[in-house]
């Protein structure tokens, strides 16, 4: 009896649409056998929608359960099997599949009940009996572990509750043990059931840092991926109490509370899903209400007096992660709309606060940037003009209120808020800047005697210069003011910001060599001053950041790039600043590096279009002579020598909302430029570039992920993957590489991904299974038909290595496909490398699946000519592959051996067998020995 595959019910003529439903079932069964479980699932779903009898529905539901089991979506597998059981309580296959799903979900007690029913229905079924024994053993092991865990938890609780313990050392040790114990599900459950949450609440109330950290980390274990325990924990501690811990002065405690709140949010948001632990918990009536309470508490924390700046930043970080949709495919953005209505003004209040100013909220140097990122993500999450208009209206009302009704202090806050918007949702910032009197106030305050007012105004002017239209206006009206500030101010903080404003205006033409805002040589002077300030250790990091901002703009000019990479001290200062606590510098550093490596997108203009544009007297961008490939390669080598990879690796590790997806994209572009030359890849790997590329390839913008994946492919092609990505890290490389196989990627990216996957597939079976699990095989097969010979060859080589896996061999052995035919035909192509790959795959498949040997003569009438051509090839590798295929075919069937011996193959093998000792000679001799064994030929008198 088979319990894992799909079944086909008999169609009933009386059922409307029975023939089409039956066709869909058959299609689903074939797709299931071929390993296309998603396709099979779709076919079964369509068959269900046509309307069927309860018996047929039960079979289709259990077929869907089989698909979900293969796809490792165990919650859905359980649901489908349960539907089948509802329609037929004695459906033993559905019961068995549900038991498999329940086992994977950790619900062993329920899985045992289903298996016992299976055994009672079919007592002689050995599969059921063996499964029941296995689960019984798992339950006994869990009971033993729980017994030992009980004793550990009890002992630690006694120490923590003992009033006689005067010192805290024992208590701290016990609390740390609780943290370790809570990482295991059994331990977390025991702590929870032993009134552990109440005890941990008492530890939080001690306000001792070590005990608070231990309590928070233990709570992480209790709440992690467990919705019911999370809700129970919140009911004991109170959501507002947990959120309030974010605001403490101690940075470590605030970060621990931030981690706990992230875990709580994940548990509430996702609920019971695939792979979650402890599904026997309580049912939650309305998790959405708990989510809103949590988010509302975070919004209130933003504007509470007495909250630390670090706590405010952590609250913003959580809101950035929690609120916006993860994917635009998700149609529900109601949480974003609710946050905008309830908390937009609170976010703007943080963004408009001045650091270290009297009467202002306590903020850090990173607070405004974090607020900008949150505002940007909220704005990007809006779906229609009406929602965006509401966002604009709320921002404008807030700014207008401060600008018009609170005197000079109100104007400063309004302008600071505009700067925050310009750094985030710039459309909203530009609209706010156009409000009556705002731009005039910015210009006027630039001439103020007070440093605080000048700082706010100059920064707003810098951010306003981002748009070409506004840059032209400021060039005409504000350059003289910025120059006066740069030359006349006695404060470095003002001078450096004025310099950045000039840099930004000077780079308004971008990489266009023909468009220069300032006179020749002016940008070089500005860049020199930026480098001077950057290298000055006496200036604080927050001020030096502006020097990097200036260089980020000026490095559009190739002359500036050349001077910058020659200045070793400036490069080292840049890399040192990127490692500092001044996180807001990351984007500027990334921008400068992208400019120096020319890793932005650039397409060579069509010469005909250029001529047409000149004829029409339209402006045609010109490339700087020093942006040619030879100059770019030289700059890349200088950056590598200066240690750019180590600096970028540290930037990737940054756990801050400032490391936005756009910033990740910049780093991905630079990494791709660094690994362009083969001789540079060893340096990148040695300095940790391979490790840094993995998170960039898995998270970020689509462009950034693709660039990082391509860089990973280049490293995998030319370096030993096991050394480049040691340990478990090598398995994380597969998914980014498979993503490069999509049709949206370029031909070069497809080719490099195929070559990299070929290398990985040749390492181990586990890696091959990972490639199969990522559904790469259908895409690789598609590229085997590609017209481009290099892509076709790479795909064939990849399939050759994958053919060592049983699942791929099953695909070739399945009836009704041309996979084997394609390999046979490719073995006779003119492209020698393609022939080598195809013949290698053919040799491997015929060795592992002898049944395929009898099908080779059936797939094409030219099979004999192709084999003879392989045997006669001057290439030893092709000869060896050909002789192995012939040997496998002869070993599989006497009839095929007879056909081969009746052809010229016999004469060719006789010649090959007499050659010098080699794999070809041995294989040819083995073929002749098999022919003698079959009595198809006679040995000569010498016994040869």
Curated annotation (Swiss-Prot):
Pfam families: TPR_16 (PF13432), TPR_8 (PF13181), UNC45-central (PF11701). Transmembrane segments: none annotated. GO terms for biological process: cell differentiation; chaperone-mediated protein folding; muscle organ development. One of its GO terms (molecular function) is Hsp90 protein binding. GO terms for cellular component: cytosol; Golgi apparatus; nuclear speck; perinuclear region of cytoplasm. It comes from the Eukaryota. The modification N6-acetyllysine is found at residues 70, 483. TPR repeats lie at residues 21-54, 58-91, 92-125. Residues 1-25 are annotated as: Disordered. Detected in spleen, bone marrow, lung and ovary, and at lower levels in testis, kidney, heart and brain (at protein level). Ubiquitous. Detected in uterus, large intestine, kidney, spleen, lung, brain, liver and ovary. Coiled coil: none annotated. The keyword Transport does not apply. It is found in: Cytoplasm; Cytoplasm, Perinuclear region; Nucleus. The keyword Acetylation applies. Keywords: Acetylation, Chaperone, Cytoplasm, Developmental protein, Differentiation, Myogenesis, Nucleus, Repeat, TPR repeat. May act as co-chaperone for HSP90 (Potential). Prevents the stimulation of HSP90AB1 ATPase activity by AHSA1. Positive factor in promoting PGR function in the cell. May be necessary for proper folding of myosin (Potential). Necessary for normal cell proliferation. Necessary for normal myotube formation and myosin accumulation during muscle cell development. May play a role in erythropoiesis in stroma cells in the spleen. Interacts with PGR isoforms A and B as well as with NR3C1 in the absence of ligand, and with HSP90AB1. Binding to HSP90AB1 involves 2 UNC45A monomers per HSP90AB1 dimer. This is Protein unc-45 homolog A. It comes from Mus musculus (Mouse). The gene is Unc45a.
């Amino acid at each position: 009896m088979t319990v894992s595959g799909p079944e086909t019910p008999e169609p009933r003529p009386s059922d409307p649409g029975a023939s089409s439903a039956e066709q869909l079932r058959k299609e689903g069964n074939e797709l299931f056998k071929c390993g296309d479980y998603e396709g099979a699932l779709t076919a079964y779903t369509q068959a269900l929608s046509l309307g069927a009898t309860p018996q047929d529905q039960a079979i289709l539901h259990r077929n869907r359960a089989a698909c979900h089991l293969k796809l490792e979506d165990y919650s859905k597998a359980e649901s489908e099997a349960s539907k089948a059981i509802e329609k037929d309580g004695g459906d033993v296959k559905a019961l068995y599949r549900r038991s498999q799903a329940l086992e994977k979900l950790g619900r062993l007690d329920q899985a045992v009940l289903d298996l016992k029913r299976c055994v009672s229905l079919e007592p002689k079924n050995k599969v059921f009996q063996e499964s029941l024994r296995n689960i019984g053993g798992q339950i006994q092991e869990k009971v033993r572990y729980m017994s030992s865990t009980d004793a550990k938890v009890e002992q630690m609780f006694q120490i923590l509750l003992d009033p006689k313990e005067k010192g805290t050392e024992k208590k701290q040790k016990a609390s740390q043990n609780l943290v370790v114990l809570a990482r295991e599900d059994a331990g977390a459950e025991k702590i929870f059931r032993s009134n552990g949450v109440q005890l941990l609440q008492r530890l939080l109330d001690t306000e001792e840092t070590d005990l608070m950290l231990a309590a928070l980390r233990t709570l992480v274990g209790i709440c992690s991926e467990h919705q019911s325990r999370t809700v129970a924990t919140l009911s004991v501690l109170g959501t507002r109490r947990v959120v309030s811990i974010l605001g403490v002065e101690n940075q470590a405690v605030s970060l621990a509370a931030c981690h706990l709140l992230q875990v709580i949010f994940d548990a509430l948001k996702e609920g019971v899903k695939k792979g979650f632990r402890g599904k026997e918990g309580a049912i939650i009536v309305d998790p959405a209400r708990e989510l809103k309470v949590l988010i509302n508490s975070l919004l209130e924390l933003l504007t509470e007096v007495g909250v630390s700046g670090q706590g405010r930043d952590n609250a913003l970080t959580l809101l950035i992660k929690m609120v916006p949709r993860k994917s635009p495919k998700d149609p529900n953005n109601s949480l974003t709309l609710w946050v905008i209505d309830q908390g937009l003004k609170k976010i703007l209040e943080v963004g408009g606060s001045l650091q270290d100013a009297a009467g202002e909220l306590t903020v850090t140097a990173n607070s405004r940037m974090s607020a900008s990122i949150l505002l940007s993500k909220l704005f990007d999450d809006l779906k229609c003009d009406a929602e965006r208009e509401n966002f604009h209206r709320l921002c404008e009302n807030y700014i207008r209120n401060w600008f018009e009704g609170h005197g000079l202090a109100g104007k400063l806050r309004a302008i600071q808020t505009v700067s925050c918007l310009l750094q985030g949702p710039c459309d909203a910032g530009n609209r706010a800047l156009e409000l009556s009197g705002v731009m005039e106030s910015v210009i006027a305050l630039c001439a103020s005697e007070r440093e605080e007012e000048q700082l706010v105004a100059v920064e707003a002017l810098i951010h306003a210069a981002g748009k070409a239209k506004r840059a032209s206006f400021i060039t005409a009206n504000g350059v003289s003011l910025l120059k006066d500030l740069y030359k006349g101010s006695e404060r470095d903080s003002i001078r450096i910001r004025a310099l950045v404003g000039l840099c930004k205006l000077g780079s308004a033409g971008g990489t266009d060599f023909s468009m220069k805002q300032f006179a020749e040589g002016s940008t070089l002077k500005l860049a020199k001053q930026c480098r001077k300030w950057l290298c000055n250790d006496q200036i604080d990091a927050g001020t030096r950041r502006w020097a990097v901002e200036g260089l980020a703009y000026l490095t559009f000019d190739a002359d500036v790039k050349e001077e910058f990479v020659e200045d070793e001290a400036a490069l080292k200062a840049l890399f040192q600043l990127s490692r500092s606590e001044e996180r807001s510098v990351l984007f500027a550093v990334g921008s400068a590096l992208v400019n120096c490596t020319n890793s932005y997108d650039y397409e060579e203009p069509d010469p005909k279009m250029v001529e047409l544009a000149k004829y029409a007297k339209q402006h045609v961008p010109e490339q700087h002579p020093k942006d040619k490939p030879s100059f770019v390669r030289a700059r890349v080598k200088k950056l590598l020598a200066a240690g750019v990879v180590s600096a970028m690796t540290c930037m990737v590790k940054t756990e801050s909302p400032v490391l936005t997806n756009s910033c990740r994209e910049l780093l991905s572009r630079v990494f791709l430029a660094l690994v362009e030359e083969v001789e540079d890849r060893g340096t990148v790997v040695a300095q940790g570039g391979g490790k840094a590329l993995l998170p960039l390839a898995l998270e970020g913008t689509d462009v950034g992920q693709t660039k990082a994946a391509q860089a990973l492919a280049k490293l995998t092609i030319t370096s030993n993957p096991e050394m480049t990505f040691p340990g478990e890290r090598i398995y994380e490389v597969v998914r980014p590489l498979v993503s490069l196989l999509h049709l949206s990627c370029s031909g070069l990216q497809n080719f490099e991904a195929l070559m990299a996957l070929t290398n990985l597939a040749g390492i181990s079976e586990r890696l091959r299974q990972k490639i199969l699990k990522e559904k790469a095989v259908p895409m690789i097969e598609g590229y085997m038909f590609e017209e481009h010979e290099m892509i076709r060859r790479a795909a064939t080589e990849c399939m050759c290595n994958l053919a060592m896996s049983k699942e791929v061999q099953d695909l070739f052995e399945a009836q009704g496909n041309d996979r084997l035919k394609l390999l046979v035909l490719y073995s006779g192509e003119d492209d020698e490398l393609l022939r080598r790959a195809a013949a290698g795959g053919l040799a491997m498949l015929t060795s592992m699946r002898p049944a395929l040997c009898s099908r080779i003569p059936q797939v094409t009438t030219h099979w004999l000519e192709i084999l003879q051509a392989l045997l006669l090839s001057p290439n030893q590798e092709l000869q060896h592959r050909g002789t192995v295929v012939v040997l496998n075919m002869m070993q599989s069937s006497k009839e095929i051996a007879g056909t081969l011996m009746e052809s010229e193959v016999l004469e060719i093998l006789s010649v090959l067998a007499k050659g010098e000792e080699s794999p070809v000679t041995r294989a040819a001799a083995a073929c002749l020995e098999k022919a003698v064994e079959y009595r198809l030929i006679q040995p000569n008198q010498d016994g040869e």
